[in-house]
Amino acid sequence: MKRLLAKSTATPDRPEGEATLLGHTALVLSAARRLLEHRGRASLLAAGLDPALEPRLRRIVLLAAALHDLGKCSEHFQSMLRRQREAPQLVRHEALSLWLCWPGQPLSAWLQRDVSELDLCLALVCVAAHHRKFQTEAFAPDGTGAGLSLELRVQHEDFARTLGRIAEELALSAPPLFTAPIVLRATRKEHPRDQLQSWQDDFERTVPAGSVDARLLAVCKALVLAADVAGSALPRSGEKQDWVDRQLTAPHPAEALRAVVERRLAGHTPRPFQEEVARSAAPLTLVRAGCGSGKTAAAYLWAARQHPGRPLWLTYPTMGTATEGFRDYLHGADVEARLQHSRAEVDFDIFGLRDGAAPGTSSRDQDRLDALRSWGADAMSCTADTVLGLVQSQRQGLYAWPGLCAACVVFDEVHAYDDRLFGCLLRFLEALPGIPALLMTASLPATRLDVLRGMCERVHGRSLAEVEGPEDLETLPRYQRLDVAEPWALVAECLRDHGKVLWVSNTVDRCMRTAEAGTSHGARALLYHSRFRYEDRVRRHGDVIEAFATEGRAAFASTTQVAEMSLDLSADLLVTDLAPIPALIQRLGRLNRRSTLERPAPVRPFVVLPFDGPPYAAPDLRDARAWMERLGTGPLSQRDLVDAWGPPGMMDAPRRQSSTWLDGRFDTWPAPCRDGSPSLTVLLEEDARAVLDGAVSAHRVTLPMNLPPESFKWRAWPRAGRLPYPIPPANALDYDGLRGARWRKP
């Protein structure tokens, strides 16, 4: 073995410099220095930490960057890169890096001559964290053929040269020289897992949750991972290291954001409500205003006036709303803007957004490059998960840190957050008080509002800044509930008058049955729900938007909950299944949406159909029925919907959400940001062939489904190459590009 590799290469005996352990370590160290120069102080301020900690932050991050890949001297890792090993590695390389350097281990005496034991341990926990698989995947499962021992090639010349470079870069004393490999054994009597458990117990007693050291550790983890991303991605993309400097020193002129607002307002002056939002200098501001009030333009004004020089990150609950936000405000604007979510590449192609900004995609290497590019953007439109994923050690959230820590952030449509996502929002706001934040919502339960107010008092020592929507617009009558059991006559009448009908069902099956019933009533429906191939779903979204935007032509859309946020349209009649109060308020936001003070429209009718069962909990539906009774059958405004929600206590108070980034300390692993439901993403057989042939990206054609019947034995379905998506047999599923997918009955 001539060289110790850190990265795969086609020529392992004559590798490129950046593929070697020495070369990659030098690149990551260089990136870490640049990150600390430009984002060290900003990172501390974002986390509410004393800027006087900057020298210590620098010491920990640089040490972690230097040591992060020493475990790649493992014979298992080297054989894997050379494709000489099919069995898993007995111990992952980042765990081995920690093992080599922890106090009492082979390299610790050298390191502790110049570094305190606590800071060494903090750095090593960052080392172990940099792939977010510690300790969950640190060791190969039993019975996988990984073996019971491995050699660490510490005697190799490349290992010695790497230690020498580290000593030179960090001004450490001369490193030790090894003359023989170190053998690590993993037997029942002697297993490194037991050592790690003991070290974890000691470390977490020394670094309690919530302590300054624990908060500093979280920041260090993010910076070390970002340095590794830069050191890995830039050489492969042909970029030079000074590219990081250019991204992190890019100016963010407030004039660019003001120009976005001026273009959106089309010559009109901002409303008093928008001016009030823009004047908020508070670290945390809550804006409660109904649909169509101009909240988003107000958010741009707020960023331009209160936080000039900071990039603006706008977050939305869904990929669809993130794309819509980008299209409406940033596409074609004279601003360095990015759209970031896992299907952004597809949206750019379908919507023709390639001029003026760049998308993000989700392959691992591309994710890294996209994250680096986001560091220098003036404005980012992304999903809430991109930002709040940081709290749960998700890849995109950690990658975003160098851009995010110096930004101001807008969280739009927070009423749409489920309990887990709202809990992540609270942890984010609590842990990062130095990042100015603007929350926007059409409505908010009293229990959530109380928690926000209490958190703001506790963290910032001041009351939550609250801005209400414009009184005259909020109280404009828009809706009227009709208490009818059979809505089809209303649908037919509306369509005869060239009106627009939106029917929202709580399940895809009900949505499809509604469309089928519409056909029998002479009303052809456009379908829009979640069970489409992604590119088909985007096209169906466009069909619905176009149909509702065309004046003088009837339109009928049968949809599911996806309509609550992603459809920016105005209906003349809304028919909806009973749903939780926040969902019903969102659905009503699609009814008579364009009515304004200048051009008020007559109130429009809505019908709520009885519903019980999944996906909603019985108490939520019970509260919704009581809310409906309070609303009555007279004309209603957006303010009426919120006021009828009821007194505090109708909903349970949000529980404190655990955070793997903030609470994990010794361990680091990704966790979900949202409440999940059982689902299965599949590839149709013809799409799988196209993906394997390179004719199409998997992200364009993946199909999200509910779990199929167990009788289908779906766990045994084949996969397309290394992709995680099963391929159902043709007789298991019906798919139509206009109607979507459903499982066949077994």
UniProtKB/Swiss-Prot annotation:
Keyword check for Isomerase: no
GO annotations of cellular component type: cytosol
UniProt binding sites for Mg(2+): 69, 131
Keyword terms, alphabetized: Antiviral defense, ATP-binding, Helicase, Hydrolase, Magnesium, Metal-binding, Nuclease, Nucleotide-binding
Stored InterPro entries: Cas3-like_dom, CRISPR-assoc_Cas3_HD, CRISPR-assoc_Cas3_HD_sf, DEAD_box_RNA_helicase, Helicase_Cas3_CRISPR-ass_core, P-loop_NTPase
Disulfide bridges in this chain: none
Record protein name field: Putative CRISPR-associated nuclease/helicase Cas3
